[in-house]
Amino acid sequence: MKTALAALIVGYGLDLLLGDPSFLYHPIRVIGNLIALLEKWLRKVFPKTPNGELAGGVFLVILVCLAGYGVPALLLFAAFKIHPVIGFLLEVLWCWQIPATKCLKDESMKVYQKLKENDLPGARYAVSMIVGRDTENLSETGVTKAAVETIAENTSDGVIAPLLFLALGGPALGLSV
């Protein structure tokens, strides 16, 4: 779409300024629900063998990627047919929702602030909100390492990759991978 770059700039600007629009259901939750539903169905369809599980997994990836691209592409097509401004606003909305820059910054700064205040229990709690491991017994160094590691990983997964795919293929590609 001709407006994709402008929508990316506006949407990413909104992400930097405002963070995720919490008043909306996030597309990643929709995709997660789709995965759970399809996985349940595919476990009934494919045999419970290593090859059956592999085939079901491949089928799941293909279906989710197709739906993740196809549904947004169709919705954008329809929105642009109704009116170009509606299509542009939908593109902006998705370009706002997909990256997680401000959210990542805000959550990581909570860890930094607690460490700065010498509040190790608070820092452990703050880092537990962004990592997938037990933080109860982490030292100050452990909290710092966990925060840096997750910031690096999530910068790749939640900022750089989404921006790359949004730039390459607009919101439809950004939502599909």
Task: Please state what every model-predicted region is.
Residues 1-176:
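Hydrophobic alpha-helical transmembrane segments
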